[in-house]
């Protein structure tokens, strides 16, 4: 956009407008320019992207024929990279195939070529799917992907199953059945509300605080790291997937930013009546006791040496309020934290707790009774929903604090072979 403003040409009026174009046109224009350079140089100078990268990049694009969300990029993909490096005749356009068949074959080709399950992270929430009868493990490429896969959050290099291998059963995959290996980490027994699921914005935070209050102390340590994170620390590290400003794990200072964030929420909520269009009534509280987040109790339960204990919290509250009144306080430093919370949870991912006391964040559609699995070559844990026939449906990827780097493999849990459909 900066370069375009220097020489706007025919785009001058567009740049003056308040039109919001989003990322899709920019990505399409980038790919168009790359294709033009390839044509000019006979493909000798400009390196072009893998098919997988193109599918990622243009997930937000629209197409009158959903099959073209795959077929349109076959001619632009680098044939020396996967999947064509090992399957040169893969994905030949055939409009006699249904959308379901094209998307299932695409998932089969990509996963069997890369020999990992990371493509599962591209499955959108069930509430967003539009193509019917797709296997649960096959992304619906006809719709935009929101939120984006967690692996794009930062340099975490998660490997929940360590270096365990997975061998694709291609014949079964083409039939819509994905055979995988892994360990069942736990069952989900408590979930939070999302921000848009209640008319009162405090209800979501109240459910999140209740999740944190239900955690055991000490928090599970399957990796025998010797770490004893408090409830508040587990909470903010889970809410941000332990990433702050592309740093993993998040620096401890992020926890203090989180405290400031909570203070700002509480102050804003308590002042709501003052900004109401109705006449202010001193006896009126905008929040009922039932849904008001019980932060005080959470801070009271912090260990004596915790930087989040109640005395530290109240001291910081006094400092923030005083600086607000004298005009020296600025919440601008919370902008990055808000971004991390939005990307990791907030309106798009649901916080959960498991029976063994793990806390995690996952797909919007997850619910109590779903199971958390560490699948070989999956990178992250996944939430699965058991079916009456013994198979499973994929709900989505997840972040589970404390088991993102192979720690679950030390828990003595049984390795199982299961089928996703």
Stretches with model-predicted labels:
Residues 1-421:
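Acidic/Ser/Thr/Pro-rich low-complexity tail/linker regions in eukaryotic proteins
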């Amino acid at each position: 956009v900066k370069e375009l403003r220097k020489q706007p040409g025919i785009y001058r009026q567009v740049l003056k407008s308040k039109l919001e174009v989003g990322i899709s046109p920019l990505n399409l224009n980038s790919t168009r320019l790359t294709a033009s350079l390839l044509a000019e140089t006979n493909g000798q100078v400009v390196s072009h992207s893998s098919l997988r990268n193109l599918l990622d990049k243009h997930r937000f694009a629209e197409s009158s024929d959903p099959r073209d969300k795959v077929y349109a990029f076959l001619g632009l993909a680098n044939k020396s990279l996967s999947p064509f490096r090992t399957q040169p005749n893969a994905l030949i356009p055939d409009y006699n195939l249904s959308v379901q068949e094209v998307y299932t074959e695409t998932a089969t080709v990509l996963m069997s070529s890369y020999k990992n399950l990371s493509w599962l992270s591209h499955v959108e929430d069930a509430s967003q799917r539009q193509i019917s009868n797709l296997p649960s493990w096959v992304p619906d490429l006809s719709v935009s992907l929101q939120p984006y896969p967690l692996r794009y959050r930062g340099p975490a290099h998660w490997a929940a199953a360590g270096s365990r291998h997975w061998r694709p059963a291609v014949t079964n995959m083409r039939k819509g059945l994905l055979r995988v290996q892994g360990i069942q980490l736990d069952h989900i027994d408590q979930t939070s509300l999302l921000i848009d699921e209640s008319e009162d914005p405090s209800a979501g935070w109240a459910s999140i605080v209740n999740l944190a209050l239900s955690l055991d102390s000490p928090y599970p340590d399957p990796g025998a790291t010797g770490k004893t994170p408090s409830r508040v620390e587990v909470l903010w590290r889970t809410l941000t997937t332990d990433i702050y400003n592309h740093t993993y794990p998040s620096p401890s200072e992020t926890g203090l930013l989180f405290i400031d964030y909570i203070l700002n929420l509480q102050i804003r909520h308590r002042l709501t009546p003052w900004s109401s269009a109705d006449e202010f009534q001193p006896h009126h509280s905008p929040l009922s006791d039932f849904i008001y987040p019980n932060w005080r109790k959470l801070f009271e339960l912090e260990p004596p040496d915790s930087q989040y204990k109640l005395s530290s919290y109240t001291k910081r509250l006094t400092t923030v309020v005083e600086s607000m009144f004298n005009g020296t306080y600025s919440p601008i430093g919370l902008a990055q934290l808000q971004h991390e919370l939005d990307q990791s949870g907030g309106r798009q991912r649901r916080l959960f707790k498991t029976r063994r006391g793990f806390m995690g964040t996952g797909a919007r559609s997850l619910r109590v009774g779903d199971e958390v699995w560490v699948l070989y070559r999956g990178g992250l844990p996944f939430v699965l929903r058991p079916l009456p026939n013994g198979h499973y449906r994929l709900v989505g990827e997840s972040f589970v604090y404390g088991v993102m780097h192979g720690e679950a493999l030390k828990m003595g849990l049984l390795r199982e072979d299961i089928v996703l459909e």
